[in-house]
Amino acid sequence: MSRDDNGWSKLYPDLLRSIFESLSCLDFHRAGTVCSNWYAVSRSCPLYPWRIVFRGKNSVLFDPIQDKIYTKNLLGIDLSKIHCLASYGNWILIVDPRLDFYLLNVFTRETINLPSLESSLRGDRPFRFIRNDDESGYFLELYGTKFLLTWNDFRFEKTAILWVNGRNGDYVVAWAIKQFYIFSYKKIGNDDDDKRWSITCTQCEDMAYKDNKLYVYTFDHYINILDFSGNSPKEPMEENPYLSHPFSFVDAIYKLRLAVTREGKVLIVLSLVGLDKKICIYKLNLKIGDWEIVESLGDEMLIFGHGVTIRAPDKDISGGGLKSDSICFLYDDYLSDHYLTMKRQPICGVFDLATSTITWHTRLEDLSSKICWFVPGCA
């Protein structure tokens, strides 16, 4: 039967969804690229996070549900000498010691080179990057004042977002440095004429991106919104409700991150310190004009610091806590008893929002501490 006969790809969505959910993760991604109908159905299937470990010239991908390990040579370079800043679906945003930025597909090994920092910058102020003499970084120059930006600046400060359209290859990248400068690049369609980073000056403790909007949390506890629907980011004309309702929280905060739900609701995710160590979530209730605690994420879960929620399995399939209402995190996202007692801490874990319990993940932790969560198929 030819592909044009009898609507070969138009199976009933429920049937197609059940088939998709029975596939291995790799076959699931291949099936989702067959046609637009299959892609649409694949987007309604539950997802779950994998882990990736960077070591030597190989990376290790771990599927926790199938309990399988895949070893890949991704770039042909020492992967311990790169920083992974963000991920989206099968793609990760990385920066190397020369401060060259790339997008990398961890399954196909496709690489997209982002513009050099030495290219001119978009913005309303005279910014420019100047390569350091020993090529260890760049000087960012503004009105004759310079400060040095190096690879080590990204070791702990990983405030960045990545969004990739899995069908047409469009993408948006943004990262912040010195907690006051946001650099962004947007590729839409085949427009490759203007390969320049845009620069926006704004306070930035964290940020999240969804539907052409970049949500930026400031040090005075407000959330700014930047509109990415045009060629360069701008503050939208419509009213920003978050500017009238700063987030005030009295308990001790270890880390704060933004996230946006699939419906577009902005969440503030807190990792707390003190006797009541836990992770909690808040959202703005516009009816009462105040922030309220989120008791449940419904059928969604999130990764601490990844900026968006994902649809998730209803039940814990593997015993690792990966299900709806759970939050995946890394060792430096949560101040655990291991840290306080100077014991060796597991590299990552999963926090159950309903029970405030943690399932620690120890598989692969002997390989490297350079590990991150990513969600295959999130596109």
UniProtKB/Swiss-Prot annotation:
Q: Which cysteines are joined by disulfide bonds?
A: none
Name the source's superkingdom.
Eukaryota
InterPro entries, per the entry: F-box-like_dom_sf, F-box_BR-signaling, F-box_dom, KIB1-4_b-propeller
Look up and give the organism this protein is from: Arabidopsis thaliana
Q: Where is the F-box domain?
A: 6-53
Query: What protein does this entry describe?
Result: Putative F-box protein At2g33190
